């Protein structure tokens, strides 16, 4: 194998691809995944998590579907009950689909009669909701006008209706259920719907000419094609890929859905992070089956932009809450990082497909980083609480929830966790790839052999891995063992992050004798005549390492992250003597001791050492610190947390003195987004960020918490302080938000007024100075003193723009 990027086709396989358009090489054989049902885990890290997913996460998610009307919507659509459609989104149907997929994966590994029958009952309701021609989106069938902003007045009217997104998750659930049980009950529903989709969408006369809107149907149709062999499913998936960014039907092109230009012309990852991961996974599926090298060239360019400029050290993607997506290159802010759980899962999907297409370990490196950090941080150790977003810093405002109004992440976790063994192995001809290290037994079928592979390891806490290879018949083949980038001075396969020291050498032995295995594309390749009893031992030294970000990542200046093996660590408040983390710095080279604590957070490695703490008066003192795996934070309640730790006193933040503003409760009156909603739907909500005492650098500084009015353009919006007691005040200072966003810009307001609370009413203050709306500075307002328990800003937003406040001081 040549040591360069290669494309491996699903039917014939490797073709070299790189940005400089080097000639393609003839493939040897395809790289094929090993079904997760053939890999049986028996470790102390993943096995308990997967069992918790089976016994807690899946049942609790189904209960939430029952409680929140997800099943009722299908029953209403199917005429099984009467009632009003429930839920706030046109894609709520996907919640049951995703959980069915996860439950099916669990059934395939460990049969549960009760769960099997429960799935039958749920599928019965879903099938009843399907219209005679195969159509299935309950809010449309139920004619829920409350959600007409999503779907319009008739089928397929709006590109962002999520009808095809619903269909895609239906197909994935149906394929999983069929493979697990052999039952066609849900598969037949999916086929009927897919036949309709193939009839309605396409390049032909009378068909709708547009892409999916929210991608997933692309890779879902490919799954349906692989199960049924029906070519039209592959062709429709290909059509959706090719139609992206063309706007044939006249719809507005948008970065949000990666629909701003044809995929072959794309070179930067933009827009909604989950949509991006799903789209590019689908593109990889289609390109592999249709032998389209041009799409893999595009995917490589886009991936290099993601991994080189937009990937968080936790493997998360998507920096902004606005649009749940990507910001500019190198915008990797920690406190406001979005890193949606679904996006980390999508990142795994995409990287796994890129590995299958190329045989390059760099994709498995990113996959592993996301898997051990960004994905599993999305679910509590108890299995019944979830993060939607996964920031790399918190002041205690983040906490996992049992469910969400937009509940995409819990269902996604249930289906992903059940399939983790799927990412461990792959085959190419008679060769075997080892991508992940988990204690397990696997029965692997190659082109002409059956091989039992048994791993014995304490990974990810211990870097010693023993792999017993037992082929059914003695045979020469290559065992390709991934040597992780973290073991070779490369946290990621780009210059986005680097270690501050050099890695200790790893070692490999076969049957007790050390070998110098050559690496090809990141894999130590062991070619020999394998026979029963052969054992490979790999030792990956797991030293505590410090990680530095590329200088262009502004929010990481003067900070270092802590990594051991594939695990990122963080400081959490309750593990520190003063319960705070931001007033500490840890100089590079500080010794840290790693020890396993079986009784803490279900058993984790803890790092202990001595940090420096900056006091309010500027003094610096030594204090002990403890660091825990990032994925396990917030399992003991809301708390401060940080992944990137200052290495000098200048970058640490002494805990500030409390102020009138910092002690206040911050509120806004949230008007409903839906245009025809009644005024009574307005709610008073907590507004976080404007009184946290983090000093902004500029009006476009979104690295720390701030308040913004989402989807509000040209309106009057309010923000209020509710004080803990009456105060006499005479001055406020407001730092306005102003930055660009593809989904709507944020600008300083056109004007504003300040009100104080007198009894139950609000009165305008008597201003002594001018109301200003300057950028990049505090806008100070003096007024006649008032004694009050509250202040309120009323901001007139500019026409066509939203706005917000970064910080608001009261004197």
Which residues are covered by each model-predicted region?
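Short, surface-exposed beta-strand/strand-loop-strand elements in extracellular ectodomains
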Residues: 165, 492-500, 505-510, 742-759
């Amino acid at each position: 194998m040549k040591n360069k990027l290669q494309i491996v086709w699903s039917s014939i396989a490797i073709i070299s691809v790189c940005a400089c358009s080097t000639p393609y090489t003839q493939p040897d054989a395809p790289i094929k995944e090993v079904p997760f049902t053939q890999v049986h885990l028996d470790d102390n890290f993943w096995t308990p998590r997967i069992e918790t997913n089976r016994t807690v996460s899946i049942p609790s998610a189904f209960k939430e579907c029952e409680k929140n009307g997800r099943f009722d919507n299908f029953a209403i659509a199917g005429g099984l009950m009467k009632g009003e459609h429930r839920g706030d989104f046109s894609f709520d149907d996907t919640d049951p689909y995703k959980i069915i997929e996860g439950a099916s994966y669990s059934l395939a590994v460990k049969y549960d009669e009760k769960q099997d029958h429960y799935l039958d009952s749920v599928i019965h309701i879903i099938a009843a909701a399907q219209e005679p021609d195969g159509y299935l989106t309950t809010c449309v069938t139920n004619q829920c006008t409350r959600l007409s902003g999503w779907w319009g007045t008739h089928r397929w009217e709006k590109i962002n209706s999520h009808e095809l997104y619903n269909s895609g998750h239906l197909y994935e659930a149906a394929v999983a259920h069929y493979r697990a049980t052999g039952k066609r009950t849900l598969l037949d529903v999916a086929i009927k719907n897919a036949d309709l989709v193939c009839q309605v969408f396409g390049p032909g006369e009378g068909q709708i000419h547009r892409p999916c809107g929210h991608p997933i149907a692309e890779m879902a149709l490919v799954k349906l094609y692989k199960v049924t062999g029906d070519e039209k499913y592959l062709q429709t998936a290909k059509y959706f890929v090719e139609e992206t960014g063309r706007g044939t039907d006249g719809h507005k092109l948008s970065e949000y859905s990666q629909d701003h230009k044809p995929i072959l012309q794309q070179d930067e990852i933009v827009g909604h992070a989950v949509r991006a991961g799903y789209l590019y996974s689908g593109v990889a599926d289609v390109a592999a089956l249709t032998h389209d090298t041009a799409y893999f060239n595009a995917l490589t360019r886009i991936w290099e932009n993601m991994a080189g400029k937009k990937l968080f050290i936790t493997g998360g993607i998507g920096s902004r809450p606005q649009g749940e997506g990507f910001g500019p290159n190198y915008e990797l802010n920690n406190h406001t990082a979005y890193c949606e759980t679904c996006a980390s899962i999508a990142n795994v999907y995409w990287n796994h497909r890129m590995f299958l297409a190329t045989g390059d370990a760099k994709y498995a490196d990113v996959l592993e980083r996301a898997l051990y950090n960004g994905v599993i941080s999305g679910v509590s150790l108890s299995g019944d609480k979830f993060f939607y977003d996964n920031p790399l810093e918190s002041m205690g405002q983040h906490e996992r929830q049992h469910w969400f109004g937009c509940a995409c992440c819990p269902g996604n976790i249930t289906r992903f966790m059940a399939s983790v063994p799927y990412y461990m192995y792959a085959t190419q001809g008679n060769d075997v790839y080892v991508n992940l290290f988990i204690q397990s037994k696997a029965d692997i079928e190659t082109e002409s052999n059956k091989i039992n592979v048994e791993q014995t390891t304490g990974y990810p806490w211990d870097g010693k891995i023993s792999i017993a290879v037992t082929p059914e018949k003695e045979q020469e083949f290559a065992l390709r063992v991934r040597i992780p980038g973290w073991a070779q001075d490369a946290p990621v396969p780009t210059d986005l992050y680097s270690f501050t020291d050099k890695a200790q050498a790893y070692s490999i032995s076969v049957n007790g004798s050390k070998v110098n295995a050559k690496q090809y594309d990141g894999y130590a390749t062991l070619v020999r005549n394998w026979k029963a009893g052969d054992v490979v031992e790999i030792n990956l030294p797991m030293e505590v390492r410090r990680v530095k970000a590329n200088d262009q990542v502004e929010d990481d200046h003067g900070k270092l992250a802590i990594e051991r093996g594939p695990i990122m660590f963080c400081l959490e408040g309750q593990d520190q003597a003063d319960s705070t983390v931001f007033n500490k710095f840890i100089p590079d080279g500080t010794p840290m001791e790693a020890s396993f604590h079986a009784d803490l957070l279900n058993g984790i490695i803890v790092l202990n050492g001595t940090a420096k703490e900056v006091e309010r008066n500027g003094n610096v003192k030594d204090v002990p610190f403890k660091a825990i795996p990032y994925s396990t934070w917030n399992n003991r309640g809301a708390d401060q947390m940080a992944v990137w730790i200052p290495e000098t006193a200048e970058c640490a933040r002494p805990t500030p003195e409390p102020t009138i503003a910092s002690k206040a409760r911050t509120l806004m009156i949230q008007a409903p987004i839906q245009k025809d909603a009644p005024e009574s739907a307005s709610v008073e909500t907590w507004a976080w960020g404007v009184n946290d005492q983090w000093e902004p650098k500029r009006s476009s500084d979104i690295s720390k918490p701030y308040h913004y009015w989402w989807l509000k353009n040209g309106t009057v919006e309010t923000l209020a302080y509710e004080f803990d007691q009456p105060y006499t005040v005479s001055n406020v200072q407001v730092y306005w938000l102003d930055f660009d966003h593809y989904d709507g810009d944020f600008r300083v307001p056109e004007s504003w007024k300040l009100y104080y609370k007198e009894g139950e009413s609000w009165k305008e203050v008597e201003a002594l100075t001018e109301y200003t709306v300057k950028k990049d500075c505090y806008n100070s307002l003096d007024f006649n003193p008032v004694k009050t328990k509250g202040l309120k800003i009323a901001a007139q937003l500019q026409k066509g723009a939203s706005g917000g406040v970064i910080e608001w001081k009261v004197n």
